[in-house]
């Protein structure tokens, strides 16, 4: 259970790096990743709704951010994936000394800490749904400034965000 986001508890000084096992890294990365996804989606999946994760906007945004970040770390896939998922879910495990990585990865990790996982998960951060809503609001306000008489609703999960929610 310590792989659940915000856990990060390890009795070892070198955390998960102590084991130096690709198998451990991938299993822990998987469980950290799913702990950053809305638990309601997992529940619906267990009830037989097998495609629920792929249909959920927030899950797709969260997964996209994670995949993009893994690719842009430009280090070994095993270490990059582990660190990215650990950072975005605020789990706190580590398997590599990312202080030795390129400087842009430090900025990326700070951004990932700020963004966080999905709503309804144990991950910290702003949450992927709020980031999605903010991006859509910025787009709608930009288009609205170009077309002041137009009406550009912001939709999140198929629903129009109210003006109170947009404020």
Please provide the spans of the model-predicted regions:
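Membrane-proximal intracellular helices of multi-pass ion channels
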Residues: 1-167
């Amino acid at each position: 259970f310590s792989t659940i986001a915000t856990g990060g508890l390890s009795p070892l000084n070198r955390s998960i790096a102590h084991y130096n096992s690709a198998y451990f890294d991938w299993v822990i990365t998987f469980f950290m990743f799913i702990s950053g996804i809305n638990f309601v989606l997992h529940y619906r999946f267990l009830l037989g709704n097998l495609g629920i994760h792929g249909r959920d906007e927030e899950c797709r945004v969260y997964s996209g951010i994670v995949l993009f970040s893994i690719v842009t770390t430009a280090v070994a896939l095993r270490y990059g994936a582990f660190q990215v998922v650990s950072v975005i879910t605020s789990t706190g495990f580590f398997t590599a000394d990312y202080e030795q990585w390129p400087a842009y990865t430090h900025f990326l990790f700070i951004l990932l800490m700020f963004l966080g996982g999905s709503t309804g998960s144990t991950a910290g951060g702003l949450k992927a749904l709020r980031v999605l809503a903010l991006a859509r609001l910025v787009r709608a306000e930009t288009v609205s400034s170009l077309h002041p008489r137009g009406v550009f609703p912001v939709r999140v999960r198929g629903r129009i965000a109210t003006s109170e929610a947009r404020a």
